[in-house]
Amino acid sequence: SLLLWIIILTIFSFLFLIINKHHPKNYRIYTLIIQNILILGFLFFVLFNSNPFSSITPIPNEGLGLNPILQDPALAIHPPLLYVGFVGSSIYFSAAMASIITNYSGKFFSQSIKNWVLVSWSFQSLGILVGSIWAYYELGWGGFWFWDPVENASLLPWFAMTALLHSLIVLEKRNLLYFWVIILCLLTFILSVTGTFLVRSGILNSVHTFANDPSRGLYILIFLTLMIFGSVL
């Protein structure tokens, strides 16, 4: 799943490079530098702590296979939709930091990220909706919404995205709430990575916890701390 995360990160970076050509060069360069730092951090995590190509020793004669409750067509749609929503927020996280560095603010900054916020918000909303429908007909899952810790972790970035969308309208039309927009840009991706940490670390008991490892959770926690520290600076 982290490979998918990195692929989506890379795609968003490439699309930003192509689509945002009319914005200042320094702003675009700093956005891509920060985006590449994020990609590098997750690449290190995959290579040294969660390599999907590492061999299993001893080789099991018969593997356990996929968890039965995950053997559903909806599960081919639900996680990728959420991932696009989560990872899509990295673009405006990087853009917000680039905006502070280059002093590129106001309605022009709002216009540069508004469509990216709309895309990630739309995919996040669809991901939550598909997951809720699947949870409803999956026997014993608890209805449309279970208020499970991991479910709530996916909802928090959605709230931040929704607030950000409304704030961007004010910034674009009235040139107000710039610092509030910056905070929401940073907060959305931080909450997305926090959700990844909660799922991977096993720190919380959750019906969504299918693969967890405390050592992997520690790496993500360190990465998350560095992100927050870098954002504050």
Protein language model regions, located:
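Polytopic transmembrane helical bundles with strong interfacial aromatic enrichment
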Residues: 1-233
